[in-house]
Every structure is written in C-alpha cells, then in structure tokens.
C-alpha cells in the first residue's frame, strides 16, 4: 500500500493488487478457492512428504503378501495340471499328434498320389519307407497313406452330388444332408467290417484304424470323376469313367494292402500257402473288391 499527497493536502492510500505465484498454496481464508490445490504434489497436512496414491501401496502390499503369492502359485499349478490332463484325455480319444502325420502333405505329393490313383499299373515299389522304425511323412513317400486326399475328396463328393441334384431339380438341404450322412455311415461300416475281419483272421499287421480310413477314402476321387463325367457326357461317360476308376482302385488297394496284411509271411520269406495265409489273401481281395461296389452304390442315383 502506498501513500501520496493530493491537491487538497490529504494523503490517499492506493491498494496494490495481490499477486499469487502459480503453484503456491492459497490461504485458507481465500473466498475464491473452491478446491484444495494439489498440483504441487505435496501433502498439506504432512509438509515435505511426497504424496502417493493409496492404490500404489495396496498393489505393493498385495504382491508382498505371502498368502497372495501362495494363491497365485497354486492357481498356476492347478491350471497347468488341468491343461495336461485335458491334453492327455483328448489324445486318448483323438490322437492329435498322429493326425498331424496324415496331413503332412504338399502339392507335389498330392499330384503324384492322384496320378497313382488314376494309373497304378506302372508303379513298381509299393513299400512304405521308414526312418528309425517310424514311417516317413507322406510328402516324402508317395506310398504313405494320408488323410488330406480322402477328406477333401469326401467334401468335394458332397458338393458335386449337390450340383448333380440341382441340375435335376431334386436339390434340397435335407437331401444333401442325407447324401453326406449316408456316405459317412457307409465309410464307418466299411472300416468296422475290415477291423472285425482282421481280428477274426488274427492278422498281425501294423495297419491302424486311421490307415483303413485313408485307404477307404481314396475311392472318392473316382466317384467325383464319374459323376462329373456323367454330368458332361451322360450315362455313357459316367459308366466309362467309373469302370476305369473301379479297376484302378482295385489294383491300388490290392498292391497296397497285400504288403500290410501279408507282411508277416513276406517277412519270413514264406509263400502264401496254408489256410491262414489264404484267408489273409482272400481278405485282401475282398477289401479291394468292396471299393468298386461302394463307388457305384453312392453315385448311380446322381446321374440320369
């Protein structure tokens, strides 16, 4: 506050504006202050102490609590144990690791395998290659069974069947579902019948159920070609294509399975003689002869 004389000789006082620096605390008596100034980061009630959020202390206390650490360790152990049990039980019913082997294919393998299914007459070596008592992946051996071609063949067969039914104005989702279900049921019946026959004949073979599914699914290639030929060239084209692929799948199955079913006699260097070995030979021929029957049964009604 300053005093200066005026013309009348009296002194007048001039009030200077009160300036508050930014960041300084305001007096409690300031009527214009609505909230406490916390921008300085200093606690009013505890001068000189840096203020921290209570959440930080609660998080640190939680991490340093022995009971919390014990609960976290127990939860992690329980989760890992549950995952291990789930993988073990899942692998018991669905052998995921084995299925990966049957889908280890590439474009070169698929092309060669399809060519072998179309024309198997000039192929000489039908033995599956092994590496340390384990069969090599299908992409390295054309004789190894795979599931890629059978699975894609089944899906393509259902689509081609829907196309054939559509050209005849007989298509409906229900009929297509029945077509796919019947093909799947016949495949399951075929595999179960072969397994039962192998058990009754007491064949000592390394054939697995997945191998039988693969060999039974190769016939879908000929079925697809037969139906497409029927759509393009009529029933004559259908019968010609089906006849060719029936003969091809018969030769392919005979030459593939005889090394599996008759492997015991072949390993001992014995000829296929005796009642037991003759039963195995007849079983091999029966499995091969069943392929053309299923091919005709599942396709003849699709071509008119």
From Swiss-Prot:
Topology feature Cytoplasmic, residues: 1-146, 204-212, 258-282
Chief place where the protein resides: endoplasmic reticulum
Family of this protein: Belongs to the YIF1 family.
Keyword Chloroplast: no
Biological role stated in the UniProt entry: Functions in endoplasmic reticulum to Golgi vesicle-mediated transport and regulates the proper organization of the endoplasmic reticulum and the Golgi. Plays a key role in targeting to neuronal dendrites receptors such as HTR1A. Plays also a role in primary cilium and sperm flagellum assembly probably through protein transport to these compartments.
The name this protein goes by in its record: Protein YIF1B
Superkingdom of origin: Eukaryota
Assigned GO CC terms: COPII-coated ER to Golgi transport vesicle; endoplasmic reticulum; endoplasmic reticulum membrane; endoplasmic reticulum-Golgi intermediate compartment; endoplasmic reticulum-Golgi intermediate compartment membrane; Golgi apparatus; Golgi membrane
UniProt keyword annotation of Acyltransferase present: no
